[in-house]
């Protein structure tokens, strides 16, 4: 039993560990009496990858793709900073327990998170046992919150409010709200409007890939109807076709024409065009 004022401590070697999904990290469900269902999630950033691979990914992130470092302690810092930032603006994330020490693990290389047995978007929206209209109502409730985060990120020029790994795998329903997770890497660009467009495309591409055409059509209709700032929603198309950097813009022009995969149904270019066409149609309808 933890005494008042003492630092909670766990011993890694004594912990029963249930592996959870996680690529490159060690992520375990572990007993934690103070946690929900008597459990917590222990995430260890020093994972299964070699130091050379961490370094290689870091060089690519920093020099080529405009992302933060992939090194273990850097990912720990990025994730914990992002969780605090998102929560400070009212977006729920997995609760953290930085006060808990785990003997046998390096400081600054792990975090104990709340065990949160919610419903992942990826599973919820394709669950035919949930009435379609109920799922669409959930999506309509999500879209304004999604927009609020985008608008806050643009207003503050804060790239850390953009979900670098954003798709329907990294949002869940929990206690009548939305919970976000996976913040190990974030973007470094200050062109936050472009990052908003990129994230919108990433989410909607995953909607199509995981849920299929019929549900994609309905969810995209709802997105266009209920996303409050249509100009900000248009950044999805601008990200694909109107990048401010002429070199990037030219490269994407060539991408579409030279690589058949970029003309497939769920490529970012096809989804961007689809969103633009729906916005144009909505504008004409309202104008009429």
What is each of the regions a protein language model found here?
Residues 134-148:
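Conserved alphaE helix
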Residues 179, 183-284:
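C-lobe/activation-segment region of protein kinase-like
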Residues 75, 91-138:
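Conserved structural core of kinase catalytic domains
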Residues 73-86:
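The N-lobe alphaC helix and its flanking beta3-alphaC-beta4 segment of protein kinase-like domains
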Residues 1-23:
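Juxta-kinase regulatory segment immediately upstream of eukaryotic protein kinase catalytic domains
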Residues 26-30, 40, 148-189:
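Active-site acidic catalytic loop and adjacent metal/ATP-binding pocket
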Residues 26-75:
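ATP-binding glycine-rich loop module of kinase domains
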């Amino acid at each position: 039993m933890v005494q008042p004022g003492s630092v909670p401590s766990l011993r890694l070697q004594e912990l029963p560990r249930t592996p959870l999904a996680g690529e490159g990290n060690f992520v375990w469900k572990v007993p934690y009496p103070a946690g929900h269902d008597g459990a917590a999630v222990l995430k260890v950033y020093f994972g299964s990858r070699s130091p050379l691979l961490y370094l290689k990914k870091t060089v690519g992130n920093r020099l080529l793709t405009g992302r933060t470092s992939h090194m273990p302690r850097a990912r720990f810092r990025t994730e914990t900073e992002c969780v605090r930032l998102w929560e400070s603006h009212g977006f729920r994330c997995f609760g953290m327990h930085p006060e808990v020490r785990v003997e046998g693990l390096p400081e600054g290389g792990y975090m104990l998170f709340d065990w949160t047995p919610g419903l992942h978007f990826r599973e919820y929206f394709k669950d035919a046992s949930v009435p379609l209209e109920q799922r669409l109502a959930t999506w309509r409730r999500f879209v304004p919150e999604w927009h609020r985060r985008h608008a806050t990120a643009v207003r503050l020029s804060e790239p850390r409010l953009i979900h670098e790994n954003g798709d329907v795998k990294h949002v869940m329903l929990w206690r009548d709200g939305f919970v976000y997770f996976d913040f190990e890497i974030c973007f470094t660009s200050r062109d936050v409007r472009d990052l908003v467009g990129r994230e919108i495309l990433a989410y909607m591409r995953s909607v199509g890939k995981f849920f299929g055409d019929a549900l994609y059509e309905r969810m995209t209709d709802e997105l266009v109807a209920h996303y409050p700032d249509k100009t900000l929603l248009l950044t999805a198309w601008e990200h694909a076709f109107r990048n401010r950097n002429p070199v990037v813009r030219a490269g994407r022009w060539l991408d579409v024409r030279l690589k058949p995969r970029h003309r497939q149904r769920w490529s970012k270019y096809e989804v961007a065009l689809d969103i633009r066409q729906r916005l144009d149609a909505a504008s004409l309808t309202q104008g009429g």
